[in-house]
Amino acid sequence: MERMNWLSRLASRGPGHRIPQGANLQTPVMADPETCLMVFKNHWSQVVRILERQGPRAAPGGADDLSAVRNHTYQMLTLLAEDRAVPSAPTGPGPLLEFALHEDLLTRVLTWQLQWDELGDGVEERRAEQLKLFEMLVSEARQPLLRHGPVREALLTLLDACGRPVPSSPALDEGLVLLLSQLCVCVAQEPSLLEFFLQPPPEPGAAPRLLLFSRLVPFVHREGTLGQQARDALLLLMALSAGSPTVGRYIADHSYFCPVLATGLSALYSSLPRKIEVPGDDWHCLRREDWLGVPALALFMSSLEFCNAVIQVAHPLVQKQLVDYIHNGFLVPVMGPALHKTSVEEMIASTAYLELFLRSISEPALLRTFLRFLLLHRHDTHTILDTLVARIGSNSRLCMVSLSLFRTLLNLSCEDVLLQLVLRYLVPCNHVMLSQKPAVRDVDLYGRAADKFLSLIPRCCRHHAPSPPRPEHASWARGPGSPSVDSSSVTTVPRPSTPSRLALFLRQQSLGGSESPGPAPCSPGLSASPASSPGRRPTPAEEPGELEDNYLEYLREARRGVDRCVRACRTWSAPYDGERPSPEPSPFGSRTKKRSLLPEEDRNNVGEGEEEELGRRGRAGGAGEGPGHLPPPQLNGVPGSWPEGAKKVRLVPKEGAGELLEGISEGMAGLEGFGQELRELEVALSNGGTGSESPLEPPLPLEEEEAYESFTCPPEPPGPFLSSPLRTLNQLPSQPFTGPFMAVLFAKLENMLQNSVYVNFLLTGLVAQLACHPQPLLRSFLLNTNMVFQPSVKSLLQVLGSVKNKIENFAASQEDFPALLSKAKKYLIARGKLDWAEGPAAGPAPRRSDPLVKSRRPSLGELLLRHAHSPTRARQAAQLVLQPGRDGAGLGLSGGSPGASTPVLLTRGGAPERQGEALRVKNAVYCAVIFPEFLKELAAISQAHAVTSPFLLETSEEGSGPLISGCGPLNP
């Protein structure tokens, strides 16, 4: 009973219930130092009489001795915790501590108690008591006890005893972690103490021991507060190891810390759900509130965040080792096969997990190894990135999750990612006519591209309501260069001194007034209009034009997006302007010869050190090298080798060159290898998009027919999927190729009418992200409407023109198209309003029965927001207060609330034969709403480039944060 009472008193010192250092203990009130010392010595004399007997006695009376020692020890340690240094010697030990150190009190008592372990009875309970007692002493002591060797020796003896095989229990684990956590806090306050806990090897050739560290490692992946407390304590030690080479070498060379972290991630990943149940049509990524509701995923994310923090603060040796173990022990053996599962549900889950991991990582070194895995690791002869690109062509949710993943990758502003996806195909400048190469660097200063994009808005989607009166002083801005004015009906007025590229800004300001450029749920273009007042219901003439007068907000958002990309790309290795890197192929240089000396299998397995050396040599002598000899990609500044298919010379042979290849010297073997790898890549890509094909999908156009054929057809036999003859598999690429990524994006974009509204939101957002990049090669490819491309290369303008024609043809064939278009606009606006508004008055919350996600489902407004890049459409959709329809039946989209998970525009009966037609019409009408907004966004981005690029590309602004070479700011 006495022992239980003692435990109950110690239990109050557990986590969350520890007595503050300034509070009085429940045991005897402190008297003067002389009295305390006398009482302390009296307790010690009682203990010494028991200790001097010949070991513990199992005979009757032995248990009484153990209980007496325990009681006296508790009283002594309570007095010792209250001991203070005398005023005459403030830096020395207090009288009680000095006596305890002289008598070696702690070690002698602990050694005697540990002898009872040999009897095998009550070991677990006694160990928990000892841990609690020492934790109380360390946490409540008013003197720096750890400075004294006898105290450290006693603690190390106890920690060593905790490594003996003892039945584990929650109380024992909690006591051990709590004591270790307190010790780590004390050591963090005095870092010089850390090396005193590093014990020398017990025998020659053995490894040193750091029990303070090794006893915490087994708890690193534990669930709940216990695991979190262990991880916090380990982080303190990691931060201390950064300044201690001895401790850093111990952790890297003599501990299993890094392997435990990496293998723990693998084990935790295997317990994640293999299928994510998401009935909502708009789900495309895992948000924080999603994974917090899944214990297995929450535990994995805690461990991943811990790895991220360790790499951030640990010693460089530990950082490098942990990164290598995560790559070789988690990414390659676990994530690689998981991304290539045969089940579509498993592929969706693994892709969503990968996107979440990339979005959650903040440390450049860890992010670098994830990107190295995506860009360079090969699974079944093709890279992970190629597999993910192919899945964009799927017509299932796999497409949405893949688009979300690439959105996250582009948000990183990593040179290597964009190089592998797009730039390496544009660098040779084979996609443009020879006479057009100098125009790659041209900047559209007069808004001609914006005018062209806005002219593609289908007539059936334009708002013809009377426009508000315009002040006469702004009439000069509506000149022939204005994108929205018919130049044939405008009388040209003398141009003012203001640059014409600012005319559109001035006209928008005169129309809509001025407002702070900060993000807001309402359009600045409508802020001065009474139609946008929250308390006013829009008139019937105004209702269809809710999204018409928002171009100024698109300009502001485009300016922010382009500025962000310019800042992030300022440290890239080349401007990619058609001259640097050089588009002209050159003879094989020394770097190529060095690479060609390696056998093919050795080239695929070049070590990281060799990759760095080859990268340095290539950069030193590659000023005049061609596109096949670009400097190897840098993963956040770390040189690496070119992936297969990108490291060889790319030449475009003329007609009849096939017969000449046999006579080319051995030095040209790289060209054949490149062609063969490209063909293998195209065949392999066909295995990625396993999603179901839409029965409503029309025949595809001629755009990049060689590449897109592989996304949709099995490799054997290559059926006649496209309308033009296919290139045979043994034929070298004889036509310009802009890469599989742009090919699949353009093909998906051209089929906007068949895509769901959610796919189109993600797809247009991804294209807008690419368009914001300042590299002239990419900017001219997407936004230069005057550029003349090769006949086999389809431009973005052609793709958009095709979509425009399809929308107009659909509108002409649909009698009730205006009514459906109005309903679709109202639905999108109301849907965004539901999730932007705060409070219960905003409308009913969307319902969800998904067991994975316990919170509200993502809204269209959040899809439009695109998590950082284009919140424009979301704010426009949220600008109106929900108003019931004129017939009092709400918006009439699906007979329910505007937040229903699957809106249906048509309700022409429930027969199965009607469902396909209803889906086709619904997707087409939503496309007609999204397409004009996308054109406005592209027009605004093209104008933002003209205003932004000349300034930020030449100067660097202070306070923009540290930039990482090769990857830009990872967390802008």
UniProtKB/Swiss-Prot annotation:
Chain residue ranges for the region called Disordered: 465-548, 573-644
Entries under InterPro entries matching the protein: FHIP, FHIP_C, FHIP_KELAA_motif
In-chain residues carrying the UniProt-annotated modification Phosphoserine: 467, 510, 523, 529, 533, 859, 897
Alphabetically ordered keywords of this record: Phosphoprotein, Protein transport, Transport
Gene Ontology CC: FHF complex
Gene Ontology biological process: early endosome to late endosome transport; endosome organization; endosome to lysosome transport; lysosome organization; protein localization to perinuclear region of cytoplasm; protein transport
Name this polypeptide is given: FHF complex subunit HOOK-interacting protein 1B
Function: Component of the FTS/Hook/FHIP complex (FHF complex). The FHF complex may function to promote vesicle trafficking and/or fusion via the homotypic vesicular protein sorting complex (the HOPS complex). FHF complex promotes the distribution of AP-4 complex to the perinuclear area of the cell.
Similarity remark: Belongs to the FHIP family.
Coiled-coil boundaries: none
